[in-house]
């Protein structure tokens, strides 16, 4: 076994050196791609997290358009943005989820990290560690424990997490609560006895800071396997894909509504939020740069006020301009920071920032031009706009998934994800700055 292990490592070193050599001229794909972020890029890490309070996409109808129609942990009917970015860059498949590779074993983890890369993204993650402790779509949650009536025997009690907007004009929270709860009640096999208590949703995820720690542990094993020079050279030519910040926008916007502050105070709060987010974001890039990263492909925040779950809170099904404005403000702050100080902060680094917000806005303004019939509702869910419940095996499913911008109440459909990734790779120049993902991948 010792001889075989040494032989395997020798072959792996040769493969790494070949990959590093052939990618230098830009004619082939990058040697690897390392992915960090939230549910828009998660390919299954959340499936391996313990506890009930974890956002997972490991049930039908998620994955219905994935090969063999299996739910993989992607919050999509098939592939997501990470998959299509990888495909566009020449990878046969997207880098696998870190937690699927037995992280304590140096065998498959290191081989994969050196040959194609690893995905560390986690649904629910934020730029700030505190984001994972909050509720998406609302800052207040009622935990409803539904127990079986006496006449029903041998059934398990169950719990629902019901989110209610505290203060969110012009939305009618009482009507929304009634619709949401009635729908969810029908989906669960539980009795009618209900007790309620207030509290925070303590969800579980892998925050960005922890994702970077996981990468550092991976890098240490890579260096041990092939040596510092080969590992450093490979990392410098690889692409580091980062897509995070949407959850921070959700949490901050709903919390701000709950505080009921003046316009001047809200502006001050937003400035402080942007400062914290930018500080953490650039600190993450700095850490990765110190570990060898040189090429950063960045997916900007989306038009979060227009996702179906937010639209469903409005009697008119309208977008929430306040949330969109908050997202646009952060996007602008990030652009300014990257354009102004990246070269000094990260010597030798290059980046491409994809304008997810702008691309989504253009698609929603004229969905038919992009081949969509429905740009407001979810394909999988229930209730109004199919967005008042999550995507469950007994959910209502749309007839043509490729004609929907959104898969569920918060995530893009597979087709929309493919359009976003293509626009960032070699699409119109207005969707990436200062260069495209393709130019980044092929840069020396």
Where are the model-predicted features located?
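Conserved active-site regions of diverse hydrolases
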Residues: 2-444
């Amino acid at each position: 076994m010792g001889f075989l292990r040494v032989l395997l490592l020798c072959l792996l070193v040769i493969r790494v050196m070949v990959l590093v050599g052939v990618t230098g001229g830009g004619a082939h794909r990058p040697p690897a791609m390392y992915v960090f972020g939230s549910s828009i890029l998660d390919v299954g890490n959340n499936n391996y997290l313990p506890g009930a309070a974890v956002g997972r996409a490991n049930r039908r109808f998620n994955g219905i358009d994935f090969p063999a129609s299996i739910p993989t942990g992607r919050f999509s009917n098939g592939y997501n943005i990470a998959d299509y970015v990888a495909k566009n860059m020449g990878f046969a498949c997207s880098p696998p989820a870190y937690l699927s590779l037995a992280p304590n074993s140096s065998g498959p983890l290191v081989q994969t990290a050196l040959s194609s890369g690893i995905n560390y993204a986690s649904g629910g993650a934020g730029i700030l560690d505190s984001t994972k402790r909050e509720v998406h779509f609302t800052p207040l949650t009622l935990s409803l424990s539904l127990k079986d009536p006496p006449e029903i025997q041998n059934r398990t009690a169950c719990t629902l997490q019901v989110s209610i907007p505290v203060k969110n004009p012009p939305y009618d929270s009482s009507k929304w609560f009634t619709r949401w709860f009635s729908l969810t009640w029908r989906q669960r096999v539980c009795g009618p006895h209900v007790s309620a208590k207030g509290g925070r949703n303590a969800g579980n995820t892998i925050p960005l800071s922890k994702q970077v720690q996981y990468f550092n542990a991976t890098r240490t094993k890579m260096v041990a396997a092939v040596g510092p020079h080969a590992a450093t050279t490979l990392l410098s030519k690889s692409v580091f894909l980062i897509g995070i910040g949407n959850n921070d926008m959700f949490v901050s916007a709903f919390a701000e509504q709950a505080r009921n502050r003046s316009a001047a105070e809200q502006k001050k709060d937003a400035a402080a939020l942007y400062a914290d987010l930018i500080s953490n974001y650039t600190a993450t890039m700095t850490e990765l740069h110190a570990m060898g990263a040189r090429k950063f492909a960045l997916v900007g925040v989306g038009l979060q006020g227009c996702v179906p779950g937010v639209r469903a809170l409005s009697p008119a099904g309208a977008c929430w301009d306040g949330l969109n404005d908050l997202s646009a403000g952060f996007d602008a702050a990030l652009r300014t920071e990257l354009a102004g100080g990246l070269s000094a902060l990260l010597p030798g680094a290059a980046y491409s920032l994809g304008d997810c917000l702008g691309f989504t806005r253009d698609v929603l303004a004229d969905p038919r031009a992009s081949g969509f019939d429905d740009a407001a509702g979810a394909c999988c869910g229930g209730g109004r706009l199919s967005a008042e419940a999550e995507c469950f095996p007994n959910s209502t499913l749309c007839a043509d998934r490729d004609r929907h911008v959104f898969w569920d109440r918060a995530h893009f459909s597979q087709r929309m994800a493919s359009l976003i990734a293509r626009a960032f790779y070699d699409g119109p120049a207005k969707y990436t700055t200062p260069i495209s993902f393709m130019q980044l991948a092929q840069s020396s």
